[in-house]
């Protein structure tokens, strides 16, 4: 009997390890679709729900991903999948499902109509992208009177139009694994064909419309997948039906 109980428990744990998907309390979801794993561009679309059914609330918008395409990231879902996984400097955007963090900006206020947690970036802010350093993939604030020797290389972008507004995509964010990828955001693209190193980038008006739409109480998430993976996983992961996703 004890052996049977142990087997049942292990089976339940195995099922739970692969059943992660969109959290039940997530009411805002951004869906990103790439044509294939090696695609450096695709489309995003915003969805929301009051009950169980997702509804599209925006048309699909063209965006850029990492120059080399996608690889599985570490978030709510995707990290246990077989295949290529995101690594630092691989120029791939993390695929899977991810919670969204706060907005980072050079401004001291959000755009009119926005109501979401934000942080004003200053000269003292760093985001650690070197896997050899403590606090990898963490935002920290240093003492400018006594900066550490690594600070200049890890300092957050200053006065860069592409980073004037950005939203954290929480890849590898909880107990970060050194070398598994860092500093992943939605941010402004430098041009229609200027790919990022792993972020999802778009024209500023599209990004600002997303910032105005987001609400912390809706527990917003981002799902980024190649089209074939989306069709295979949408039901198990609680994603919008493929017929609703115009990018497919």
Annotate each predicted stretch with a short phrase:
Residues 199:
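Short cysteine clusters
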């Amino acid at each position: 009997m004890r052996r049977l109980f142990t087997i049942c428990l292990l089976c339940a744990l195995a099922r739970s390890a692969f059943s992660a998907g969109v959290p039940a309390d997530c009411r805002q979801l951004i869906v990103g679709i790439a044509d294939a794993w090696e695609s450096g561009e695709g489309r995003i679309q915003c969805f929301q729900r009051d009950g169980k059914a997702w509804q599209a609330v925006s048309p699909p918008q063209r965006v850029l991903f990492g120059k080399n395409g996608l690889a599985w990231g570490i978030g709510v879902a995707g990290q246990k999948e077989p295949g290529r996984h995101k690594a630092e400097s691989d120029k791939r955007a993390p695929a899977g499902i991810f919670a969204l963090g706060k907005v980072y900006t050079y401004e001291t206020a959000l755009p009119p109509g926005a109501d979401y947690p934000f942080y004003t970036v200053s000269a003292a802010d760093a985001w650690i992208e070197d896997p050899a350093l403590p606090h990898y993939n963490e935002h920290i604030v240093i003492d400018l009177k006594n900066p550490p020797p690594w600070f200049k290389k890890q300092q957050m972008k200053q006065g860069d139009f592409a980073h004037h507004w950005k939203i954290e995509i929480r890849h590898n964010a909880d107990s970060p694994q050194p070398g598994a990828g860092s500093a992943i955001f939605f941010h402004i693209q430098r041009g229609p064909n200027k790919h990022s190193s792993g972020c999802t980038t778009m024209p500023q008006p599209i990004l600002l419309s997303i910032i105005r739409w987001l609400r912390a109480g809706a527990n917003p998430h981002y799902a980024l997948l190649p089209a074939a993976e989306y069709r295979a996983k949408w039901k198990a992961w609680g994603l919008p039906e493929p017929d609703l996703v115009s990018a497919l």
